[in-house]
């Protein structure tokens, strides 16, 4: 379930390992692309190897690698996808793999046995390898809900990026932009808990962020957008920025005046989340779990009735 702050950490991780290095081979090892056929333009890209990785960027929950010769690799992580790295000559053993900053954060809040199981399971599902002379970057995905796609040409990239709403962490996504997107006519009769997850409206917010954002905002997730005041929308916006930037880069969040001495994050209460997948909140109130989603993929919202009155 990686969300925008984690996607940005993966982008930094991949950039650190592969930027300005040549990819000399790509192998499909496991997962959906092994069993159902390779991702689009896989064979074409392989024929053009070696090829240098120039940069790694993100928009919302989409990560994309910029290569030479106008190639782009697009990555979505689904529920269980991620990236890890193994130096050349090292055996594929748990302690030899490098993981992103995300793993450090999880290890501080998840039991050791669960983390150990997660890492082992990830290594057992290395689905795609991008090899350089210095080592290999692996895409892992235990459930194979994530995707990899190769496209060619800046026009194709821009076409994809235009399908996504403004990135919630982007500096240009200010309150005016946020409010305009949230209050589009198509959203007015929808629950705010659904609208926040619509990647065409605002990109980057997923299931756990929406629960915690609305909890901090003291807004019931089933409230319709047309029933929210401008003041309430501002509170939601502020907490979107706080939870995404606060988890990603505290120093930068302080510089941007998103995080201040009064700001609180889940880690301040020794928790991974405020209410997502929790039995009680930080005050001991019962957390309610209910279905709230659009489309075919079932999603649950977590909220506290005493704090988030309808």
Model-derived features: positions:
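N-terminal functional module of multi-domain proteins
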Residues: 39-42, 49-96
């Amino acid at each position: 379930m990686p969300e925008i702050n984690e996607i940005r950490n993966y982008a930094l991780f991949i950039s650190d390992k592969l930027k300005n290095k040549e990819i000399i081979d790509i192998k499909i090892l496991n997962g959906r692309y092994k069993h159902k056929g390779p991702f689009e333009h896989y064979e074409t890209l392989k024929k053009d190897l070696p090829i240098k990785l120039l940069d790694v960027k993100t928009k919302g929950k989409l990560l994309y690698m910029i290569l030479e010769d106008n190639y782009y690799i697009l990555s979505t992580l689904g529920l269980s996808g991620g990236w890890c790295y193994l130096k050349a000559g090292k055996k594929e053993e748990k302690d030899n793999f490098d993981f992103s900053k995300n793993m450090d954060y999880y290890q501080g809040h998840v039991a050791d046995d669960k983390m150990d199981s997660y890492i082992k399971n990830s290594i057992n599902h290395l689905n795609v390898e991008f090899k350089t002379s210095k080592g290999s970057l692996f895409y892992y995905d235990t459930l194979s809900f994530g995707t990899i796609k190769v496209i060619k040409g800046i026009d194709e990239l821009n076409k994809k990026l235009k399908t996504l709403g403004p990135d919630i962490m982007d500096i240009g996504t200010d309150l005016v932009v946020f409010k305009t997107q949230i209050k589009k006519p198509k959203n007015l009769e929808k629950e705010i808990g659904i609208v926040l997850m619509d990647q065409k409206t605002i990109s980057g917010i997923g299931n756990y962020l929406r629960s915690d954002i609305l909890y901090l905002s003291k807004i019931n997730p089933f409230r319709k957008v047309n029933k929210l005041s401008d003041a309430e929308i501002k509170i939601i916006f502020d907490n979107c920025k706080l939870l995404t930037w606060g988890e990603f880069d505290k120093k930068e969040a302080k510089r941007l005046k998103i995080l201040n001495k009064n700001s609180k994050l889940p880690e301040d209460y020794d928790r991974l989340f405020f209410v997502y997948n929790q039995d009680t909140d930080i005050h001991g109130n019962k957390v309610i779990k209910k279905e709230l989603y659009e489309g075919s993929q079932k999603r649950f919202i977590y909220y506290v009735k005493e704090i988030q009155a309808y």
